[in-house]
Regions:
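A short alpha-helix capping/helix-coil boundary motif
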Residues: 1-2, 107
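Active-site His/Glu-centered metal-binding helix of metallohydrolases
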Residues: 3-8, 24
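Acidic/His/Gly-enriched intrinsically disordered linker/tail segments
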Residues: 13-163
Length: 164
């Protein structure tokens, strides 16, 4: 996670916006390491913030989850404004950063990956940049929420598992 921040700063020069910075760091930090090979996007269920999927799993009622602070709304994640208090809901914010990044790269059969990479090559990742390069926040939010809900499944014993 921290190495990703350093690489972004010194080599990648990605936009400094928090949702991009923390999203990429969480994305790589929660990617699976097998036989000394990191597989970006292959989810390590025991990594932070993924391990919070069990406790903070979306209920299926997007508006209720936003209102309760269970899930941070996409507009708040991107603008770093609104949404639940970061001090008391830090895990919800980081689960949002991670899942949004994972969704933009892998969700909807990769339809947002090109736009996300274009955004990463720019100087900023504001709400206007997001809508220009990726799409309307309200449309993307619905798809991302469904994706986040689908990341957590139940096994026979009722334990939350990461599904892909």
């Amino acid at each position: 996670h921290e190495a990703t921040h350093q690489l972004n700063e010194q080599v990648g020069h990605t936009p400094p916006d928090k949702w991009v910075n923390e999203g990429l760091a969480s994305y790589f930090g929660a990617s699976k390491l097998e036989d000394y090979n990191l597989t970006p996007g292959k989810i390590e269920a025991k990594a932070y913030p993924v391990w919070w999927l069990g406790k903070l799993r979306p209920t299926g009622d997007m508006q209720k989850d936003f209102a309760s602070g269970r899930v941070v709304p996409l507009r708040a994640l991107i603008s770093n404004s609104g949404g639940p208090d970061l001090d008391t809901h830090v895990n919800q914010w980081y689960l949002g950063y991670w899942s949004l990044t994972h969704f933009l790269l892998h969700g909807e059969k990769g339809k947002y990956a090109e736009g996300y990479r274009k955004l990463l090559a720019g100087k900023s990742a504001t709400l206007a940049d997001f809508e220009r390069d990726i799409g309307p926040v309200d449309v993307v939010q619905k798809e991302w929420y469904q994706y986040l809900q689908g990341l957590a499944g139940d096994d026979v014993a009722g334990n939350v598992i990461v599904v892909q």
